[in-house]
Amino acid sequence: MLSPRRVKFRKQQRGRMRGIATRGNTIAFGTFALQAQECGWITSRQIEASRRAMTRYTKRGGKIWIRIFPDKPVTMRAAETRMGSGKGNPEFWVAVIKPGRILFEIGGPEITEELAKEAMRLAQYKLPVKTKFLVKEEQEAAVEATAQTAAVES
């Protein structure tokens, strides 16, 4: 499972998830992608389960890119421990997800849209956030259309 090799600080505060993703929100490597529609934490186990589901369905054809990395430690206290005496130990790692973030990409000559859609659907079931299937050409056309409307307005 994914986790950082070494970190500057072992423990982190939980933080807040506000706003939308400004980075990692366009398809960069593959032809098809899975985009988050809401915010949340995705654990390294969930990422691995999604990756395995997609790989198994595509029969190892094409290539899968994981666009998120679990770099936030989540700490937990031992069961039946009294209050106080410091923060618990890191138990697992999560990736903080904002709406619009690309989670997975898939591509290759043997990957059709139907195959990619079904593989992404199987991965979707393993994730705790709502997601949306994207096609690179459609996303590029949408970005171009918004750029043209912005140019006309100004």
From Swiss-Prot:
GO cellular component terms, A-Z: cytosolic large ribosomal subunit
Alphabetical GO biological process terms: translation
Pfam families: Ribosomal_L16
Gene3D superfamilies from the UniProt entry: Ribosomal protein L10e/L16
Keywords for the protein's UniProt record, in alphabetical order: Ribonucleoprotein, Ribosomal protein, RNA-binding, rRNA-binding, tRNA-binding
GO molecular function, one term: rRNA binding
Annotated PROSITE patterns: RIBOSOMAL_L16_1, RIBOSOMAL_L16_2
HAMAP family xref list: Ribosomal_uL16 (MF_01342)
Family: Belongs to the universal ribosomal protein uL16 family.
General function of this protein: Binds 23S rRNA and is also seen to make contacts with the A and possibly P site tRNAs.
Quaternary structure, from the entry: Part of the 50S ribosomal subunit.
The protein, known as: Large ribosomal subunit protein uL16
